[in-house]
Amino acid sequence: MATTKPYRVLLYYMYTTIENPEEFAAEHLEFCNSLELKGRILVAKEGINGTCSGTVEQTEKYMEAMNNDPRFDGIVFKIDEADGHAFKKMHVRPRPELVTLRLEDDINPHEITGKYLEPKDFYEAMKQEDTVIIDARNDYEFDLGHFKGAIKPDIESFRELPDWIRENKEVLEGKKILTYCTGGIRCEKFSGWLVREGYEDVSQLHGGIVTYGKDPEVQGELWDGQCYVFDERIAVPVNQKEHVIVGKDHFTGEPCERYVNCANPECNKKILCSEENEAKYLRACSHECRVSPRNRYVIQHELTEEQVAAALEQIEAGK
């Protein structure tokens, strides 16, 4: 792989048996720290789900070690070049599940999952009639970017998806179902759940959006916006042929691809907004959050009560 930037961001997962996740997590954290990697890795009895950053040399050593562990035989790393670290710290945490569905009867993707479609096949399938495309991500991920014509489930977390499907089953009945997520891990379980629910024609994008955007043949075509990623980059491009902005500023509705967290720590909602509107609205999604005594924007910028009052007055005057 030709390298032009000094750092890399790795994204990977694998459903495989890890007998003692707590012990593995502690040892793996020590190993990652010895390589000076930064990132976030989740470990469960059902496998591993990680994203981390480091120099080319550090990430090469990490991938080599993982490939040499028989538990991770066949693991696939999605690699992005970067100018620096994409994370501030290194976390390796044991979890009950790699992705939180909290099903009473869990799905094992080795036993049941939807058909895997490579990017070109997924591209062709999206253009067919009687096909529904379901985004298996959260609402704020969809709002930044999605495939043309994809359905946005009204959910704030992955575990809400099965209930949404049951409440909206008329949308799916008799249709070919395509589903996708960032790197593929959520769809492994979600597509398997759909099959178990009785849907007969269920396919998933193999390798997720990240792989689709890098595919030399499809080049991210039929994707609008950017792809939300869970690191300091926040967003990465997908469509190499055209860039259509689908994100809308929380306050004005204007095209926007800049995410911030609401300044009220009790809310912390992700909102799309310009730098100008961040300042104007004190980085708060609502009036209640603007006047919160814990508003981080107010504290960070050391705004006086008079300055906050003036900002609130200006917002009222503009309504």
Curated annotation (Swiss-Prot):
Transmembrane segments: none
Active site as annotated: C181 (cysteine persulfide intermediate)
Enzyme class: oxidoreductase
BP terms from Gene Ontology: tRNA modification
Pfam families: Rhodanese (PF00581), Rhodanese_C (PF12368), UPF0176_N (PF17773)
Catalytic activity: uridine(34) in tRNA + AH2 + O2 = 5-hydroxyuridine(34) in tRNA + A + H2O
CDD domains, alphabetized: RHOD_YceA
Keywords associated with the record: Oxidoreductase, tRNA processing
One MF annotation (Gene Ontology) recorded for this entry: oxidoreductase activity, acting on paired donors, with incorporation or reduction of molecular oxygen
Function: Catalyzes oxygen-dependent 5-hydroxyuridine (ho5U) modification at position 34 in tRNAs.
Protein name, entry field: tRNA uridine(34) hydroxylase
